[in-house]
Amino acid sequence: MKIFGTDGVRGKAGVKLTPMFVMRLGVAAGLYFKKHSKTNKILIGKDTRKSGYMVENALVSALTSIGYNVIQIGPMPTPAIAFLTEDMRCDAGIMISASHNPFEDNGIKFFNSYGYKLKEEEERAIEEIFHDERLLHSSYKVGESIGSAKRIDDVIGRYIVHLKHSFPKHLNLQSLRIVLDTANGAAYKVAPVVFSELGADVLVINDEPNGCNINEQCGALHPNQLSQEVKKYRADLGFAFDGDADRLVVVDNLGNIVHGDKLLGVLGVYQKSKNALSSQAIVATSMSNLALKEYLKSQDLELKHCAIGDKFVSECMRLNKANFGGEQSGHIIFSDYAKTGDGLVCALQVSALVLESKQVSSVALNPFELYPQNLVNLNVQKKPPLESLKGYSALLKELDQLEIRHLIRYSGTENKLRILLEAKDEKLLESKMQELKEFFEGHLC
């Protein structure tokens, strides 16, 4: 049975993520990390979901039962776990979060001792241990060999200092009015502190988590409220994070949501202007707009494509010796400061860009026009191989003949089919998307 999806393990708390399942997974992961253990410490953080307590306690029980010492740091962004795992010399880090999913879901993400997400072969190794009944039951410790657990509440300060170091030392935010939407999630404490300490005039919304309101009509997936607040407050910028703050959506001074590909383009060129790029390559996923590639080429930069998912962006960056890349969804990686997407690092870089451009954000963050794209997330009841659907190949052939770029795939974390179309003719795009929706609704819904 395959346990891992495209971003760790994710599912409905109490259904897939039961205490027994989580404990078994915790033992399996712990035994895997034991093979290369240096400090016998594992760090655990979480977002603000109510089920986080259940999952955390199950993991702590599992890891201490095989001799690991566990450090619990409470609600913190996913990128903070990646940073602190390496900074605190832990064998591994674990983030309990389902990211942008509703509060009923939860998930578990693993990081190695260097703060990187696990590769697929490492996940498969954990799955093999998970299914090895004899190994699991022979691994429990007794007496003094059982591990300990302790909670540390002040590590947020380390992460705040780290974030501030990512911001240019010759700048401050005193001239900027900024609205932050923390999605009632993991950034609700740290984001306001960072921006306030750097001098910004800050308004914070959706910063009162109650365990059940994470991502609820707010944050990166629902930035309309942020857009309204930016206009009402006459702010220079608005930043919306998702539940675990590894994703960022930016709103300009006019209340417009800045497209993720425009953000990648303008930030890449900004990094080049500071001689901060380690190579001429910038990494983006196959969902990126063709206009991004053309814009970067005009700036003597090369776009490298990779599979969808920020861990694949990170791997592709390492392969191409690049230190900047991301997804149009808002997972943007500055690897000099973060091993995974970090919404706060990205927000600080956007702020610096706007300051140094000496332009309003609606101008500074609008470097090129995009080709029309249409993205639909279709709820599905089953996930058969797309190639097995009668008429599917003919549909793709027709799209190719019409010069409509297409990317159709199942979500790795939800029961959804993602359909992306891109073409120069917007009306043609809309009509073909309607055809595709009807086709897939007939086969999958």
UniProtKB/Swiss-Prot annotation:
The highest taxon in the source lineage is Bacteria
The positions flagged as active site in the entry are S99
Which PROSITE patterns does this chain map to?
PGM_PMM
State where Mg(2+) binds.
Answer: S99, D242, D244, D246
Q: What is its EC number?
A: 5.4.2.10
Query: Which molecular function GO terms apply here?
Result: magnesium ion binding; phosphoglucosamine mutase activity; phosphomannomutase activity
Q: Which residues carry this modification: Phosphoserine?
A: S99
**A Pfam family in this protein?**
PGM_PMM_III
**Is the Magnesium keyword given for this protein?**
yes
| UniProt record, GO biological process | carbohydrate metabolic process; peptidoglycan biosynthetic process; UDP-N-acetylglucosamine biosynthetic process
Q: Does the keyword Metal-binding apply?
A: yes
Q: Which UniProt keywords apply?
A: Isomerase, Magnesium, Metal-binding, Phosphoprotein
Which EC class heads this enzyme's classification? isomerase
Q: Posttranslational modification, per the record?
A: Activated by phosphorylation.
Q: How is the cofactor bound?
A: Binds 1 Mg(2+) ion per subunit.
InterPro entries per the record?
A: A-D-PHexomutase_a/b/a-I (IPR005844), A-D-PHexomutase_a/b/a-I/II/III (IPR016055), A-D-PHexomutase_a/b/a-II (IPR005845), A-D-PHexomutase_a/b/a-III (IPR005846), A-D-PHexomutase_C (IPR005843), A-D-PHexomutase_C_sf (IPR036900), A-D-PHexomutase_CS (IPR016066), Alpha-D-phosphohexomutase_SF (IPR005841)
Q: Which cofactor does it need?
A: Mg(2+)
Give an example GO cellular component term for this record.
cytosol
Q: Which reaction does it catalyse?
A: alpha-D-glucosamine 1-phosphate = D-glucosamine 6-phosphate
* UniProt function note: Catalyzes the conversion of glucosamine-6-phosphate to glucosamine-1-phosphate.
Family, as annotated: Belongs to the phosphohexose mutase family.
Which named protein is this?
A: Phosphoglucosamine mutase
User: Gene behind this chain?
Assistant: glmM
